[in-house]
Amino acid sequence: MDTSRKNRIIKITIWVVCSIVVITALLAAAAFFWPAASKQLQSSSSEKLSYNDAIAAANRTVSGDTSNTDVRSECRSIIKTHGKKTAKAVMMIHGVSACPQQFADLGDTFFNAGYNIYIPRVPSHGLTDNKRHGEITIPAMAQFMNSSTSIISGLGDETGVVGLSGGANMATWITQYNSQTISRALLLSPFYQPSASETPSWKIPLLRNLYGRNIFPDSFTGSNLSYRALGKYIIIA
C-alpha cells in the first residue's frame, strides 16, 4: 500500500473517531443539561365551570372509563357529590402506577364530612396491563391536570387537592398554576426526585431527559414502576 493511501486511511479513521467522540459528548451534554421545562407545562388552560358543567364533565370521564375495557373496574374515576355545590370540595390524585381506588376510603371520609369529591384516573393508569402506565405522555398529563382542575372548580366554593407520590407532583403543578381556583394542597410523599439511597443525584438528569423524553426504551424498577413514567413526573416537578 502506498504512503498516500495509508495517510488517507489514517485521516479518515481519525475523522470518524473524532466525530463519534463529538456526537457522544453532545448526547451526554443533552442528557444532563436539557431544560426540564416543557411547553405544555408552562401555563394552565383550565377554566372555571358551573356546578352543572363540572358534573357533566366528570360524568363523561367516568363513563369513558366504564366503556373502556382496558380500564380495571376498581380503577375508574370517582365522583361523589351532595347534589349541589358545597362549601368545600377536594380532588385526589393517586400515585405512579396506582389508580383512584388508592383514595377511595379517604374520599369517603371527606364526603361524609360534607365535601364533594373527585378522584380522577391518571391517563394510562389503572389498566389491565399495569405496565402500560409507562405509556403516559407529557401532553396527556397536562390535559389531565387542566381538565381535572376545571371540574373541581365547579364542585365547591373552596377547593383543594390531595396528591400522593407522582400525584403530589401533579398537585404541586396544579396549585402553582391555578392559585385562583385551588386554595389548599396536601402533598403526600411527593416524587420530586428519587431518594439518594435509590438513585445517585447525578443519574436524575438521565432519568428525566433520556427516559422522561422517551429516548431510551422503557425499563421497570423492582416494584414495576416505569422509568419513562417516573422521568415524566420529575419533569412536572
Residue ranges and their predicted role:
Residues 2-23:
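N-terminal Sec-pathway targeting helices
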Residues 23-40:
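Membrane-interface motif at the C-terminal end of an N-terminal transmembrane signal
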Residues 43-71, 190-237:
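The alpha/beta-hydrolase serine catalytic core
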Residues 71-122:
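Short, surface-exposed "cap/lid" segments of acyl-processing enzymes
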Residues 127-160:
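Catalytic nucleophile-loop/oxyanion-hole region of alpha/beta-hydrolase
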Residues 162-167, 171:
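Gly/Ala-rich beta-loop-alpha elbow adjacent to hydrolase catalytic centers
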Residues 173-183:
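Conserved hydrolase catalytic core segment
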